[in-house]
Design a protein with these regions (language model features):
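Catalytic-loop region of hydrolases
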Residues: 27-103
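Accessory cap/linker subdomain of secreted extracellular hydrolases
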Residues: 32-48, 234-335, 353-354, 362-369
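Short beta-strand element of the alpha/beta-hydrolase
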Residues: 92-95, 103-116, 120-128, 146
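Alpha/beta-hydrolase active-site loop
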Residues: 140-143, 167-189
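Primarily recognizes the serine-hydrolase "nucleophile elbow" in alpha/beta-hydrolase
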Residues: 182-254
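Short beta-strand/loop motif that positions the catalytic acidic residue
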Residues: 342-350
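Catalytic histidine neighborhood in serine/cysteine hydrolases
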Residues: 365, 369-396
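Catalytic active-site module of serine/aspartate enzymes centered on a nucleophile-bearing elbow/loop
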Residues: 382, 389-392, 396, 401-437
């Protein structure tokens, strides 16, 4: 077992032990983001005149897990970023400092899979001591963050969904991630100005942010791109239109459908409720601030026909939906130049999702293996180094072997070792052609 894997396993065990005893001792929660002035910009200069990645506010506090402060310093930055529509926004990132850093600082940008429509579930709130149901995911992720801190690396964790919790809006996730790194490198409070190596890592919702950051970096943030050593992603949402059909009628993941509709509506400032049935509108209202924890397994067998009016038999029959969802297909924003590790499950039946739909095929229950393979092959064709691993597991269980591979893979990238690639052995996948408008 390598040192990297040992650190990961140790981190998981320590976090599990800590979480089991810490909850009774958690202190009073801080104000939620919508009530906390730190999350708002009050400067006189219009945001549109401020460059993305500019630091607007800074505060320093202890890194909290389930409300308990740890002896780890967290620098939180409010910074300027960009919405899905290109509008100026503000967002928060958390920079966790290692207890002992040796030599030139190295940075791991960890993208959380908090998957929520509620801004109170974002990582920055959990890190500052906040407790919510959806925010339990960032608490558990401390098991993944701890090993990197123990290795002497700084960990940067952006609120990837932005201030409005724009669920599944991939390009916005990517910009929030890249701008958070610009801010972290520029802030005098973080001590990262001399950083030369940055690694990206994220699973599921975190993979959305990680992949889009990697593909947008060459054009949107070349200063960050020049420092990237690699990006590790797993459980990847490549083509959201395909995923909507894949999870339809499934036992565990069908509740993602209304969450995705809400996320697209919010990110693109469109109203999809006129196309919904009365039941669809009820779910829309019920889930407007829901996390994945409130949707997973709660709507078994849910279909599009239940959500939409009869005159809209498929999502593709709604022009405004088609126009927006086409913009969320991975690979349409550019090509990564940093090496990639991609892990994907392909036995979704374990989580109640059939793998026999035409043009879709097998997946992990929520993400589609054929889509991921096609994306990997496209990047290979553009000259990127890609290692693709496919597992006969579901989405939740794939995370285990993926982490065991991703941690040492990223460790090797920081060490300067040549990235492996298996482009020649990746099997063909699904077409990723945008829907005709």
């Amino acid at each position: 077992m390598t040192k990297a894997i040992r650190r990961a396993v140790l981190g998981v065990l320590l976090a599990a032990t800590f979480l089991s005893i810490a909850v009774p001792f958690a202190g009073a929660a801080p104000p939620k983001p919508e009530e906390d002035p730190f999350y708002s910009y009050s400067g006189s200069t219009p945001l549109a005149q401020i460059a993305p990645g500019t630091v607007l506010k800074t505060r320093t506090l202890n890194y909290h897990v389930v409300g308990v402060p740890l002896p780890v310093t967290a620098v939180q930055l409010l910074y300027r970023s960009t919405s899905e529509l290109g509008e100026p926004t503000v967002n928060v990132t958390s920079v966790l400092k290692p207890l002992l850093s040796i030599g030139t600082p190295q940075v791991v940008a960890y993208q959380s899979f908090y998957d929520s429509l509620n801004p109170a579930d974002e990582p920055s709130y959990a890190i500052s001591g906040g407790l919510t149901l959806g925010g339990a995911i960032p608490q558990v992720e401390s098991a993944l963050i701890g090993p990197e801190l123990l290795a002497g690396r700084t960990v940067v964790i952006a609120d990837t969904e932005g201030e409005g919790a724009d669920f599944a809006a991939g390009p916005e996730y990517g910009k929030n991630t890249l701008d958070s790194l610009k801010a972290a490198l520029a802030s005098s409070a973080t001590g990262l100005s001399s950083t030369k190596k940055i690694g990206l890592i994220g699973y599921s919702g975190g993979a959305i942010a990680t992949e889009w950051a990697a593909e947008l970096a060459p054009t949107y943030a070349p200063s960050v791109n020049s420092k990237l050593v690699g990006a590790a992603i797993g459980g990847v949402l490549v083509d959201p239109a395909h995923n909507l059909h894949y999870v339809e009628g499934s036992l565990s993941w069908a509740g993602v459908m209304p969450m995705a509709i809400i996320g697209v509506s919010r990110a693109f400032h469109i109203d999809l409720t006129p196309y919904l049935s009365e039941y669809g509108k009820q779910l829309y209202a019920k889930l407007e601030k829901a996390s994945i924890a409130e949707a997973l397994g709660q709507y078994p067998g849910l279909t599009w026909a239940q959500l939409a009016k009869p005159e809209y038999p498929t999502p593709e029959s709604i022009p405004v939906y088609v126009h927006t969802v086409n913009q969320l297909i991975m690979g349409t924003g550019g090509t990564p130049t940093t090496p990639l590790l991609i892990g994907q499950g392909a036995l979704g039946e374990l989580e109640g999702t059939a793998g026999d739909k035409p043009g879709i095929g097998e997946g992990d229950g929520v993400m589609i293996a054929g889509d991921v393979r096609t994306l990997a092959r496209e990047y290979c064709e553009h000259g990127d180094k890609v290692q693709y691993d496919q597992y006969a597991l579901g989405h939740i269980t794939t995370a285990v072997p993926w982490i065991a591979t991703a941690v040492p893979w990223l460790e090797a990238r920081f060490a300067g070792l040549t990235a492996p690639q298996d482009c020649g052995s990746i099997e063909p996948g699904n077409a990723l052609t945008p829907i005709a408008e």
